[in-house]
A protein has these predicted regions:
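A short, N-terminal "cap"/entry segment at the start of jelly-roll beta-barrel domains
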Residues: 1-39, 52, 85, 129-139
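Short beta-strand His + acidic residue motifs that chelate non-heme Fe in jelly-roll/DSBH
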Residues: 51-53, 72-73, 95, 101-108
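Conserved short histidine dyad/triad with adjacent acidic residue
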Residues: 26, 41-58
Length: 139
């Protein structure tokens, strides 16, 4: 399924090949599906890139790694963020609401991940071509 041809089905029941969608995604972030209580996005983090230290007070997050390797950082406070471990394909990262976190691409290929937010975090239809675009947004 080509990224540009995917049509967001909103809150309708949907069947997706998450591995293909994630690996084919070339954008820093793309919203794939948003329901009332849950949202799916895919991300491509460039070599040496990162999500950036962030905190979601209102959202739990489930992040799956489909391609690449990364280091993961967690903390109860911004100043208390520490290295937790490395992840690769088939690992998941679970981030409870209120946890500071960062994911850094440590590999020599783009890091391909998907993220499930509960409740939804990004506006429906969100596409950030680069991290810079994401940083300019208010969400």
């Amino acid at each position: 399924m080509e990224d540009e041809k995917f049509i967001n089905s909103g809150d309708k029941p949907t069947l997706l090949n998450i591995s293909d969608l994630t690996r084919q995604n070339m954008y820093y972030r793309k919203e794939i599906w948003t329901g009332e209580y849950l949202q799916l996005t895919v991300m491509s983090i460039p070599v040496g890139g990162e999500i950036g230290l962030e905190l979601h007070n209102e959202n739990d997050q489930f992040i799956g790694v489909e391609y690449g390797v990364a280091s993961v950082y967690f903390g109860a406070t911004k100043q208390g963020v520490k290295f937790i471990g490395n992840v690769k394909r088939d690992y998941v990262i679970i981030v409870p609401a209120g946890t500071w976190h960062n994911i850094i691409n440590e590999g020599n290929v783009p890091l391909k991940i998907y993220s499930v937010y509960a409740p939804p975090h990004h506006p429906k239809g969100t596409i950030h071509k680069t991290k810079f675009d994401s940083d300019l947004s208010d969400y």
